[in-house]
Structures are given as structure tokens and as C-alpha cells.
């Protein structure tokens, strides 16, 4: 019996040591994976910040670009262009996305609902440059010129899947008792959706809209095929317009050191803009 107790105690100690060792190994591997994911991100952010912060000043945000080789100037036209194109995209994508999300949430088992959900997932995986080419063939070629509103349409296609899926998920999270109570009181279905369901899901829906806007604000490829670019200040949606991602692209590939410095600064501004939209979305969820 004493030998049996000694053997059992020894095997129990071995199992305990093995569990502690395996736990330490897994914690180390998990920490290494986190470092591999985080270090490149902070490296990129630090590089962009160090290379771009020196070019930031008041003129950079308020002045128009200068010709190649001429120092000074800014990205005021690109800031305005980004606001216009993202705003146009939201005007198009928001009502369509909300209504489609409502339909797929409330009619998820119908053939049309299943088809819409499948199509949304497919569109979400399409590269943004393909969206730009599609809008180029759909709008730009028939009109024979680039325009801000064609860029807004391209961004709307990019934002739609995000808004649709977010709206659908948020509507599904609303307790069915709220809808049933409103219908039991005699409210029509459209009024129930508008006055009861949507307010209950609005914080989550707004988060999806903010994330969609953040995604669209960083797109350069579709803008090259639709809005094209403009070195001047323009608020005419029927004319070409420039955005921040386009500015980063054009300045970065130029051989002029001043433009390359502005490319880093523009990238820094774009990062802070996207970060602001993402943080705002998180705060909306927390609130």
C-alpha cells in the first residue's frame, strides 16, 4: 500500500508538472503570436508618424497643392474631396443598406432573403479595384468623363455589404417581444419597424455605418477609375475630384522629395481619420 501511494503521488506530481509546463508553453506561444501581430502594426504607425509629422502645419490643411518642385502647399482639396465622395457614398448606401438589412433580418428563410445574403457575402469579398472598374464601365464611359458622384457610387458599392450585414445582425438582436407587443397594439408592420425596432438597434447600425465610412475613406483604387483627381478645389460632383488616398498614391510615386514628404503626411492624416471613425464607432457601442 505504501508503494502504491508513493507511485500514485509520483504520477500525480508528473501530471501537475506537465500541465504547468504545457500551460507555460501555450502562454509563451500566445504571447509570441500577439507580438507578431502587434509589432508590425506599431512599426508601420511609428514610421508613418516620424516621416509625416514634420510636414504637418496649418498651410498643409488649408492650402491647395503646389506644382511639382515648388515647396509649400497643402491638401485642402483632397480633404474636401474625401468628405464629398464618402458623403455621396453614404447617401446612396445608407437607405439601400438599411432596407436590405431589414428585409434579410425579417425574411431570412425566404429564397430572396437567402439570395440577398449570399450576394452580400460575395460582394463583400470583391476587390475594391473591381468595383472601380465596374463603375467606370457603368457610369464613366457612357458619360465620357470622370466625376465625384461616380466615385461616390463606387464607394457605395464598397459600403453596402458592411451596412447590410451590420443592420441584419443588429435587427436580429432586438427581442421579438418588442415587435410582437407593438403589433399586438395594432401598429402596422412598417411603423413597428420604424418606431420600435430601428431605435432599439440604432446604436449597432450606426456603428456599422461608421465602420463602412472608415473603410471607404481609405480606398484609392476605385477613385482612380471614377473620380480620377483634380489639382484644384472643386465641390462640383459632376467634375473630377481628388481624395486623400489618391493624394498619397500620386505623391508617393513622384520623384520629388517635397511631394514624398507630403505623401507621408497625407498618409498620417488618413490614418488618424480612419482611427477617429473606428474609435467613434466603438464609443457608440459602449454608450
What do the PLM-derived regions correspond to, one by one?
Residues 127, 185-186, 199:
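Glycine/proline-centered hinge or cleavage motifs at structural transition points of membrane proteins
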Residues 80, 84-92, 96, 100, ...:
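Hydrophobic alpha-helical transmembrane segments of multipass integral membrane proteins
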Residues 168-172, 183, 210, 250-287:
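C-terminal transmembrane helix and the adjacent membrane-cytosol boundary/short C-terminal tail
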Residues 9-32, 46-89, 109, 250-261:
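Periplasmic/extracellular loop-to-transmembrane helix junction in inner-membrane transport proteins
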Residues 189-225:
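Transmembrane alpha-helices
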Residues 89-120, 133, 281-287:
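Transmembrane-helix boundary motif in ABC transporter permease subunits
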Residues 121-157:
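Generic hydrophobic transmembrane alpha-helix motif, especially the helices
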Residues 68-69, 223-271:
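Interhelical loop and adjacent transmembrane-helix boundary motif
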Amino acid at each position: 500500500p505504501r508503494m502504491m501511494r508513493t507511485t500514485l503521488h509520483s504520477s500525480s506530481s508528473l501530471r501537475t508538472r506537465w500541465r504547468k509546463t504545457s500551460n507555460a508553453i501555450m502562454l509563451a506561444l500566445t504571447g509570441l503570436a500577439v507580438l507578431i501581430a502587434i509589432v508590425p502594426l506599431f512599426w508601420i504607425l511609428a514610421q508613418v508618424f516620424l516621416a509625416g509629422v514634420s510636414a504637418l502645419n496649418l498651410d498643409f490643411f488649408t492650402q491647395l497643392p503646389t506644382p511639382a518642385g515648388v515647396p509649400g502647399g497643402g491638401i485642402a482639396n483632397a480633404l474636401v474631396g474625401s468628405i464629398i465622395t464618402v458623403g455621396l457614398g453614404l447617401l446612396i448606401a445608407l437607405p439601400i443598406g438599411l432596407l436590405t438589412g431589414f428585409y434579410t433580418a425579417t425574411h431570412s428563410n425566404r429564397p430572396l432573403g437567402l439570395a440577398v445574403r449570399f450576394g452580400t457575402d460575395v460582394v463583400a469579398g470583391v476587390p475594391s479595384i473591381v468595383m472601380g472598374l465596374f463603375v467606370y464601365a457603368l457610369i464613366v464611359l457612357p458619360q465620357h468623363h470622370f466625376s465625384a458622384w461616380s466615385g461616390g457610387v463606387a464607394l457605395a458599392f464598397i459600403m453596402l455589404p458592411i451596412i447590410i450585414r451590420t443592420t441584419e445582425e443588429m435587427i436580429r438582436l432586438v427581442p421579438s417581444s418588442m415587435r410582437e407587443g407593438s403589433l399586438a397594439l395594432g401598429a402596422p408592420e412598417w411603423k413597428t419597424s420604424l418606431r420600435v425596432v430601428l431605435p432599439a438597434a440604432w446604436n449597432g447600425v450606426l456603428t456599422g455605418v461608421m465602420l463602412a465610412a472608415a473603410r471607404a475613406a481609405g480606398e484609392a483604387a476605385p477613385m482612380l477609375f471614377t473620380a480620377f483627381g483634380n489639382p484644384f478645389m472643386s465641390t462640383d460632383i459632376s467634375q473630377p475630384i481628388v481624395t486623400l488616398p489618391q493624394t498619397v498614391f500620386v505623391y508617393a510615386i513622384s520623384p520629388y522629395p517635397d511631394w514624398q514628404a507630403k505623401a507621408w503626411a497625407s498618409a498620417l492624416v488618413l490614418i488618424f481619420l480612419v482611427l477617429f471613425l473606428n474609435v467613434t464607432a466603438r464609443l457608440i457601442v459602449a454608450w
